[in-house]
């Protein structure tokens, strides 16, 4: 699947400190120590609706990681999937009277436009689940052969994963069983399905039903479950020893827990990823942003209104990536004003020395992507430049390059 074009990333003199990120499994901030090539897998969209600000905030967080790794001199192997075969997609296509494949193609195209407008660096591999069916089938076969999966008896011989197949299951989320069961039911699971060995067992392969797409397999025609898609794509594109698995905090359980468990079953490793990183949720004017409330703020909608995507990006980066936070007109207005001040300061013929502020920006971003502190440091430099001027002719360009390279904001 085609991704999108990335804008060039400036090279900033100097070197960033070691990157440290909060790991959901360990419940602490600790160093990320990739080799020459840093690897990251981030869960992509289910393409049945347009990109909203919650999506955007998540992908901006991992874009920062991508940029900081580049600043450290790493090659980056970044993989993102598209869940282009799933119930919400089929339901929306049926509601709108369109082919599900056409709907998916339309929404993926819009997502690409939104990501390019927000200057999110494109993934190395952008893979639809429908493009990875062979790898998914191979992984399900391995799980069946090892006893980690079983075929359900009955009219629909679906394949399920045994939630007790690994001793470490549950380490990523740290949730107790009751919490798991509640979230499993809320987020696409089927704890009440008759015939399963355990209520928490997760669907690997849904046997063919009338009116649904299906693919042939050794265990019968059908289509992939949700979690196995990401496990198969990550293992086939990156392999074991992933540096970062990421997504929104609503994916911690069941999606990321099961994705990791599926992969760990076949690799024998205790951890699918060295770091599990999750971004907070975005609300609107004090309320949770959701389709049911009808209060989604769409990136494409803001662009259509003439809002500068750089201001959208800067507004989302004003909050810490792990925090649940709210978008509002005030947030946007502050971002627009900040963008104007930064542009005015970085187009001066000279300004205050920039070495110290560049070092602080790197330091703050390396400390679990502390964008509020990094932005505050840049605000301070811009205020000094506009109020008092300076004699360093290189400083304005250096600050502009730093903002571009590390924060992804083009002034």
Swiss-Prot record:
<feature type="binding site">
    <location>
        <position position="43"/>
    </location>
    <ligand>
        <name>Zn(2+)</name>
    </ligand>
</feature>
<protein>
    <recommendedName>
        <fullName>L-cysteine:1D-myo-inositol 2-amino-2-deoxy-alpha-D-glucopyranoside ligase</fullName>
        <ecNumber>6.3.1.13</ecNumber>
    </recommendedName>
</protein>
<dbReference type="GO" id="GO:0004817">
    <property type="term" value="F:cysteine-tRNA ligase activity"/>
</dbReference>
<keyword id="KW-0862">Zinc</keyword>
<dbReference type="GO" id="GO:0010125">
    <property type="term" value="P:mycothiol biosynthetic process"/>
</dbReference>
<feature type="binding site">
    <location>
        <begin position="248"/>
        <end position="250"/>
    </location>
    <ligand>
        <name>L-cysteinyl-5'-AMP</name>
    </ligand>
</feature>
<keyword id="KW-0479">Metal-binding</keyword>
<comment type="similarity">
    <text>Belongs to the class-I aminoacyl-tRNA synthetase family. MshC subfamily.</text>
</comment>
<dbReference type="GO" id="GO:0008270">
    <property type="term" value="F:zinc ion binding"/>
</dbReference>
<keyword id="KW-0547">Nucleotide-binding</keyword>
<dbReference type="GO" id="GO:0005524">
    <property type="term" value="F:ATP binding"/>
</dbReference>
<comment type="subunit">
    <text>Monomer.</text>
</comment>
<dbReference type="InterPro" id="IPR017812">
    <property type="entry name" value="Mycothiol_ligase_MshC"/>
</dbReference>
<dbReference type="GO" id="GO:0005829">
    <property type="term" value="C:cytosol"/>
</dbReference>
<dbReference type="InterPro" id="IPR009080">
    <property type="entry name" value="tRNAsynth_Ia_anticodon-bd"/>
</dbReference>
<feature type="short sequence motif" description="'ERGGDP' region">
    <location>
        <begin position="186"/>
        <end position="191"/>
    </location>
</feature>
<feature type="binding site">
    <location>
        <begin position="43"/>
        <end position="46"/>
    </location>
    <ligand>
        <name>L-cysteinyl-5'-AMP</name>
    </ligand>
</feature>
<dbReference type="GO" id="GO:0006423">
    <property type="term" value="P:cysteinyl-tRNA aminoacylation"/>
</dbReference>
<keyword id="KW-0436">Ligase</keyword>
<dbReference type="InterPro" id="IPR024909">
    <property type="entry name" value="Cys-tRNA/MSH_ligase"/>
</dbReference>
<feature type="binding site">
    <location>
        <begin position="81"/>
        <end position="83"/>
    </location>
    <ligand>
        <name>L-cysteinyl-5'-AMP</name>
    </ligand>
</feature>
<feature type="binding site">
    <location>
        <position position="230"/>
    </location>
    <ligand>
        <name>Zn(2+)</name>
    </ligand>
</feature>
<dbReference type="Pfam" id="PF01406">
    <property type="entry name" value="tRNA-synt_1e"/>
</dbReference>
<feature type="binding site">
    <location>
        <position position="226"/>
    </location>
    <ligand>
        <name>L-cysteinyl-5'-AMP</name>
    </ligand>
</feature>
<dbReference type="InterPro" id="IPR014729">
    <property type="entry name" value="Rossmann-like_a/b/a_fold"/>
</dbReference>
<dbReference type="GO" id="GO:0035446">
    <property type="term" value="F:cysteine-glucosaminylinositol ligase activity"/>
</dbReference>
<feature type="binding site">
    <location>
        <position position="282"/>
    </location>
    <ligand>
        <name>L-cysteinyl-5'-AMP</name>
    </ligand>
</feature>
<feature type="binding site">
    <location>
        <position position="58"/>
    </location>
    <ligand>
        <name>L-cysteinyl-5'-AMP</name>
    </ligand>
</feature>
<comment type="function">
    <text>Catalyzes the ATP-dependent condensation of GlcN-Ins and L-cysteine to form L-Cys-GlcN-Ins.</text>
</comment>
<keyword id="KW-0067">ATP-binding</keyword>
<feature type="short sequence motif" description="'KMSKS' region">
    <location>
        <begin position="288"/>
        <end position="292"/>
    </location>
</feature>
<feature type="binding site">
    <location>
        <position position="255"/>
    </location>
    <ligand>
        <name>Zn(2+)</name>
    </ligand>
</feature>
<dbReference type="InterPro" id="IPR032678">
    <property type="entry name" value="tRNA-synt_1_cat_dom"/>
</dbReference>
<feature type="short sequence motif" description="'HIGH' region">
    <location>
        <begin position="45"/>
        <end position="55"/>
    </location>
</feature>
